[in-house]
């Protein structure tokens, strides 16, 4: 189970730069015009063989240059509640501010370890400013420069040393893990209640630390499954969940620990930015997807035409991944709830699809010969052999070609679409790799 590292701090201390440094990305919030928040605050990192997730909670705050103290407080409370390790970023060039003091007051009550990161220590002289931060009462300030990378390797060592030991979970690998995710008020709690009913349906619960996901095993409607449950569904939130960054961070653990994500959309509101943010997390983690249009009972025009238009809109907003089941349901009336579980199980089975090598080549090579990759500067690309990789999280295929470097993304999407036409891969991402033959 991945550990979660949260970066907190007041504006302009270098949180985004540190996030990019830790996740080895250039998806900077820095120097970027405001737009969609997808993919900007969440990333994966690995150090000393330990994989963990990094979240910059401040990335969801609008107009962070003029942030209100209340928003900072909510951001820090979120980190205290959710994170395994908290990075409190301060600025050695500006010294201790009133806002730093307020953040530190909250963090001193945190159960998770807090590492105070003294950023912008771009030269040795600036290190002499760091002792000022002892007054915050959070131990030693750790000097780094997020821009140059100075000190970040040692910081990663320290982060990993703070992680709890891996919890051993006794889970049956043959039983699917479903997570219900979605923005606030989309009906997550209602559909969970519709799934599980009374507590007597619980078979067993397995939990690690208080911040770990709880895997609750159920047998409903003849289905055996684990429901991945985090604090976000049943626990009363300490922070107002209307905050966009809050609902997205809440979804991280559920998504990471699930096989299939049931994404709830509100039929009365359509697709909103938070839905796309959560979808992005699902795709980044390569999880199966079932989309549920909840509150369909509140829509007056329930004609087949309206359903088709609604479905087309969703697929266009979720593109390029469009091969997933969409179910129009009502958690309140339990309309099509059984269908949701059926589709989730089907997607789980599709994730484990194994296609024999002989069939892959029989079906795909004639198609490739008829529609070959576009030539590049007079060089013709030939794909000669296809095989499926073993032991992968999702179906993954290798196409062996003479000039793999010239096979572009549009042609890979063409191959993926043709594979989805020939085999049932609905709801699951697939990977296509082009390699030298």
Curated annotation (Swiss-Prot):
InterPro entries: G_ENGA (IPR031166), GTP-bd (IPR006073), GTPase_Der (IPR016484), KH_dom-like (IPR032859), KH_dom-like_a/b (IPR015946), P-loop_NTPase (IPR027417), Small_GTP-bd (IPR005225)
Superkingdom field: Bacteria
One biological process term in Gene Ontology: ribosome biogenesis
Membrane-crossing segments per the record: none
Keywords: GTP-binding, Nucleotide-binding, Repeat, Ribosome biogenesis
Sites where the protein binds GTP 1: 9-16, 56-60, 119-122
Domain annotation EngA-type G: ranges: 3-167, 176-352
Annotated ranges, domain KH-like: 353-437
Assembly and oligomerization: Associates with the 50S ribosomal subunit.
General function of this protein: GTPase that plays an essential role in the late steps of ribosome biogenesis.
Family under the similarity heading: Belongs to the TRAFAC class TrmE-Era-EngA-EngB-Septin-like GTPase superfamily. EngA (Der) GTPase family.
Protein name: GTPase Der
Gene name per UniProt: der
């Amino acid at each position: 189970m991945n550990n979660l590292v949260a970066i907190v701090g007041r504006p302009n201390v270098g949180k985004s730069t540190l996030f990019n440094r830790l996740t080895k990305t250039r998806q900077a919030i820095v120097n970027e015009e405001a737009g969609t928040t997808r993919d900007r605050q969440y990333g994966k990192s690995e150090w000393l063989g330990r994989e963990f997730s990094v979240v910059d909670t401040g990335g969801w705050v609008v107009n962070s240059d003029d942030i209100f103290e209340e928003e900072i407080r909510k951001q820090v409370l979120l980190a205290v509640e959710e994170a395994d390790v908290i990075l409190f970023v301060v600025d050695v060039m500006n010294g201790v501010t009133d806002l730093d003091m307020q953040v530190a007051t909250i963090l001193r009550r945190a159960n998770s370890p807090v590492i105070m990161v003294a950023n912008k220590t771009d030269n040795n002289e600036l290190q002499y400013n760091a002792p000022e931060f002892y007054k915050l009462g959070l131990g030693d300030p750790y000097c780094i420069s997020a821009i140059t990378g100075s000190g970040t390797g040692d910081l990663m060592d320290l982060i990993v040393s703070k992680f709890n030991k891996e919890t051993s979970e006794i889970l049956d690998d043959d039983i699917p893990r479903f997570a219900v995710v979605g923005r606030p008020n989309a009906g997550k709690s209602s559909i969970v209640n519709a799934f599980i009913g009374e507590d007597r349906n619980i078979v067993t619960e397995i939990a690690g630390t208080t911040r770990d996901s709880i895997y609750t095993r159920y047998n409903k409607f003849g289905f055996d499954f684990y429901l991945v449950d985090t604090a976000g569904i049943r626990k009363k939130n300490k922070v107002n969940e209307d905050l966009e960054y809050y609902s997205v961070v809440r979804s991280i653990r559920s998504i990471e620990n699930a096989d299939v994500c049931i994404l709830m959309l509100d039929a009365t509101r359509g697709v909103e930015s938070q839905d796309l943010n959560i979808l992005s997390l699902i795709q980044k983690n390569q999880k199966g997807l079932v989309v549920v249009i909840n509150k369909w009972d509140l829509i007056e025009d329930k004609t087949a035409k309206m359903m088709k238009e609604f479905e087309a809109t969703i697929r266009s907003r979720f593109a390029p991944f469009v091969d997933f089941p969409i179910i129009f349901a009502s958690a309140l009336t339990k309309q099509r709830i059984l269908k949701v579980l059926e589709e989730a199980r089907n997607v789980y089975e599709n994730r484990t699809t194994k296609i024999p090598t002989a069939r892959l080549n029989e079906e795909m090579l004639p198609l490739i010969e008829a529609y070959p990759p576009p030539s590049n500067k007079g060089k013709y690309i030939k794909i000669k052999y296809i095989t499926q990789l073993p032991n992968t999280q999702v179906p993954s295929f290798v196409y062996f070609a003479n000039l793999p470097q010239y096979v572009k993304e549009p042609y890979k999407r063409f191959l993926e679409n043709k594979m989805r036409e020939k085999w049932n891969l609905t709801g699951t991402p697939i990977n296509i790799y082009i390699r030298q033959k």
